[in-house]
């Protein structure tokens, strides 16, 4: 069995006085496209920075491609590439100068592949960085990452500012990158419909905690949503059930099949099931964020 690309063991990072990332424990398989999803402020960018070796760790252990990020940060950065709208290359003036500068740090830089990527992305070496659109800067960041032939590619909102055709091209390039089975991608994006199509592993973050993770098919089959009538006292205290929304006795309930008692045990009690449906990745994330497991619910919440 191959060593995982990423291993988090009780990782904790105090991002600010009011926000703590973790503790997180997670393994991301080598050769996977992992979707890192969650609402704004969940801790996704902070985690990506730690994986890149540019973010500090307050407790726990982080292994990337078999290296401890706190002890082998240089090696981690050499084998890992980050694509982010926050990276600025304006200081070098043009695309060509930027490429000349960045390529000098990487002995494995593939100049021919870089030229091919520029053509496919519609970029020219003579273009000035400050003339690029937001989407153009994302494309340049992707070119610089892919031309390195890194083993781990980290992407932070790479489809931001891209039109549908450019987003399709982005994923085409990512799939080409993944033809080498030793490579791994971790991608953070709010385009969950696209991630559901391409990602084979998902990690969901909320308020600095991992609320769900697993292969995409397993995660989507693990959860279902019920439209129910609550028992007379209107309380939910059953293992595997999370209240998503409520209006009087009627409620939407998220069911975690992995946490439910065995069939026939009467786990649903007096709940009267009106309907049941499977969830998309986006719907599952929203339901997990909105729900509150193991808490007695009394307030009314709209079902719309």
Q: Where in the sequence are the language-model features?
A:
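A short, flexible loop at the N-terminus of ABC-type nucleotide-binding domains that lies
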Residues: 1-23, 30, 35, 73
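The feature captures the beta-strand-to-loop junction immediately N-terminal to the Walker
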Residues: 37-39
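Helix-to-loop junction immediately C-terminal to a conserved catalytic motif
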Residues: 52
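Conserved ABC transporter NBD signature motif
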Residues: 60-71, 76
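ABC-family P-loop ATPase nucleotide-binding domains
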Residues: 84-140
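Catalytic Walker B motif of ABC-type/P-loop ATPase nucleotide-binding domains
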Residues: 153-157
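ABC transporter nucleotide-binding domain
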Residues: 171-258
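Short, charged/small-residue-rich alpha-helical element at the C-terminal edge
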Residues: 224-302
